[in-house]
């Protein structure tokens, strides 16, 4: 296995089955999105969109707690020891504690692409995505 990410596959079941060995080799788990390949793309975009919104909210949480004199490490520990113990919160939260913004800036550029794709997909579906509007203007 090359990496630990899951692979989202969309398309005709026979086509996915033909690719199964490759999909199993590159991901820890295969998620079947259905017969429409666009569904797999929507999942990928939505996944990164949610991550971008989470990073934005986390940054605001760090800013708020700093304004009240809370040490960033304390907020980080509270945040990642409970409901937000997921790797994304631990990795990006640690970058905020350490004020190592280079990684966050790099991810923001990549995240902006998917935020804009999510906004376009939402617009095409007649679905407003208010968090995405914030991400695309930051």
Where are these regions (language model features)?
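Helical "substrate-binding/catalytic lid" subdomain
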Residues: 37-138
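Short glycine-enriched loop/turn motifs at secondary-structure junctions
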Residues: 1-3, 102-103
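Short beta-strand and adjoining strand-loop segment in the mid-core
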Residues: 2-24, 30-33, 46-54, 62-68
């Amino acid at each position: 296995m090359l990496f630990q990410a899951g692979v989202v596959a969309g398309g005709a079941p026979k086509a996915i089955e033909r690719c199964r060995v490759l999909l199993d080799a590159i991901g820890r788990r295969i998620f079947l999105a259905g017969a429409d390949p666009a569904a797999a793309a929507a999942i990928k975009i939505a996944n990164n969109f949610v991550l971008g919104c989470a990073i934005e909210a986390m940054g605001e949480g760090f800013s708020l707690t700093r304004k009240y004199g809370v040490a960033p490490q304390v907020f980080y520990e509270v945040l990642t020891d409970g409901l937000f113990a997921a790797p994304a919160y631990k990795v990006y939260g640690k970058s905020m504690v350490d004020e190592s913004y280079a990684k966050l800036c790099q991810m923001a550029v990549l995240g902006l692409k998917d935020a804009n794709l999510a906004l376009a997909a939402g617009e095409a579906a007649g679905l407003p995505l208010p968090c995405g509007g914030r991400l695309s203007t930051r």
